[in-house]
A protein has these predicted regions:
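Mature catalytic domains of secreted/periplasmic carbohydrate-active enzymes
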Residues: 20-482
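Bacterial Sec-dependent N-terminal signal peptides
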Residues: 1-20
Length: 482
């Protein structure tokens, strides 16, 4: 934790000097630090939207990348039995992926309505796929059209609209920060397949700089980096331009995916990414991303039970923040430009909870312990950052055979927040003696009391009935306790 405080303090110090110049190497780039707003904002919306939103299909296989609908083109090309059988039966064996482009119309796209949903969700920033691995761009990219030899962006293609620009304006008008996911590689780009060095210097570099210069993102979520090292991608050179000469030198935040050798490293310049994972080291700035279902892109094959409940999503956010991270929660819009209503409903439910309890989330830090466990054997928790099969809702579910999470904790300055998953007549924080005995439930005017009992601090909840709680989970604020 001391390391994280140092990183944030160092970040503030570096931004005091406008004369800082960064060389094209990680030693220099890591001196830049990460803008403090990112770690404070905690919650963002991820959007996967592209040509894959037309077939919008993947088999539903939990904890497997095979469930990613946005990988449709790659899967049918590699002959995946699930994707290939679906494609051949619905579209025909000779139907080419490029033929989905005229079907990507976005005719019902209303960026203001999207932005309103995001605002109401309580998210503080939004990250849109400017370009996924298929190479199709949501803004007017001349490099895309030139190197694909066809209209391969939303402006010159069928939508005839700057989808990225329109959403960017609406999101910023709603008071949120806007960022972009950008794939370094493109599966079947002719230039990528024939001359990777030329692809980097003549396609990627000018395209990336065009995106940044025109739209000025607050976040860049790079991906598709694993095919080559950071040296082969010339990533340090590109990031030196971003930090020194771009229009977003002070504000932009970047992830750790800039070469097959960069994930989890360079924590001075990049935040660490986890994908359907079990979380990261709380001493670094990290972000967990996952969908509401098993896919990032919209998957029509998912059923109601494949979507996380609103309560499970709220617990996911609480859990990630309690462990010192950010949550980037993904939605997959349909090809017609609408956000599936069930996804909207989940986001609004999260926002309703945050309206009452946001004090325990935004601007907080991880406490010395993220959880308090019940008595019993703790379930084994794998630490993978990819497809870990991890569920905060399951960890917090009372059971007889193993221990479960009774409470989650966050802190802000001298205040401790105890987040309780379900009503309990008594909250007992083990081994804790607060510096002051001032307790209240967020969103409630009911008086509750706390007392010391040996080494434990007990909060009496008996003055409240379960239906008198404003929200579940509920939050007990222990003011000046630390």
């Amino acid at each position: 934790m001391k390391k994280l405080v140092f990183l944030l303090s160092f970040t503030l110090a570096t931004y005091m000097s406008n004369a800082q110049h960064y060389e094209a190497n990680w030693e220099s780039l890591n001196k830049r630090g990460i803008p403090a707003w990112f770690h404070q904002d905690k919650f963002g919306i991820f959007i996967h939207w592209g040509l894959y939103s037309v077939p919008s299909y993947a088999p539903v296989i939990p904890n497997s990348g095979e469930s990613y609908a946005e990988w449709y083109w790659y899967r049918i090309r590699e002959g995946n039995k699930h994707f290939r059988a679906f494609h051949d039966s619905v579209y025909g064996k000779n139907f080419q992926y490029q033929q989905f482009e005229p079907m990507f119309k976005a005719e019902l796209f209303d960026p203001k309505q999207w932005a309103d949903v995001f605002k109401r969700s309580g998210a503080r920033y939004v990250v849109l796929t400017s370009k996924h691995h298929e190479g199709y761009c949501l803004w007017d990219s001349k490099e895309a059209d030139r190197d694909w030899g066809r209209a391969w962006n939303a402006v010159t293609g069928t939508p005839q609209r700057d989808l990225l620009g329109d959403l960017t304006n609406a999101v910023r008008d709603a008071g949120l920060k806007m960022g972009y996911y950008y794939s370094l590689y493109e599966w079947f780009n002719p230039l990528w397949q024939t001359d990777k060095e030329k692809f980097v210097t003549e396609h990627l570099f000018p395209q990336f700089k065009d995106l940044v210069t025109k739209y000025k993102p607050s976040v860049i979520f790079s991906d598709g980096e694993w095919e080559m090292s950071d040296t082969a991608w010339h990533s340090p050179e590109l990031l030196a331009w971003l930090f020194n000469d771009s229009p977003v030198t002070k504000d932009v935040v970047i992830d750790d995916r800039w070469g097959g050798n960069t994930r989890g490293k360079n924590t001075g310049a990049t935040y660490t990414t986890s994908e359907y994972g079990a979380g990261m080291d709380p001493n670094v700035i990290w972000e967990e991303s996952q969908g509401i279902g098993h896919s990032y892109g919209y998957n029509r094959n998912e059923q109601l039970d494949d979507y996380k409940t609103s309560n499970a999503l709220i617990l996911t956010l609480i859990d990630v923040v309690a462990r010192g991270g950010n949550l980037l929660l993904d939605i997959g819009p349909a090809a017609d430009g609408t956000i599936p209503v069930i996804m909207q409903q989940r986001l609004i439910d999260m926002g309703n909870w945050l309206q009452v309890n946001g004090e325990a989330i935004y601007g907080t830090e991880a406490w010395k312990q993220s959880y308090q466990w019940s008595e019993g054997k703790k379930p084994e928790k794998k630490g993978e950052s990819y497809m870990a099969g991890y569920s905060a809702a399951e960890l917090a579910k009372p059971r007889k055979d193993t221990a479960y999470v009774e409470y989650f904790f966050t802190r802000k300055d001298k205040d401790l927040f105890c987040i309780v998953p379900a009503y309990a007549p008594q909250v007992r924080i083990k081994g804790f003696r607060p510096a002051a005995n001032k307790v209240r439930i967020l969103g409630s005017n009911k008086t509750i009391t706390g007392k010391q009992s040996g080494n434990d601090f007990i909060i009496d909840m008996s003055s409240l009935k379960p239906d008198e709680l404003s929200t579940t989970p509920f939050v007990v604020r222990l003011q000046d306790a630390l």
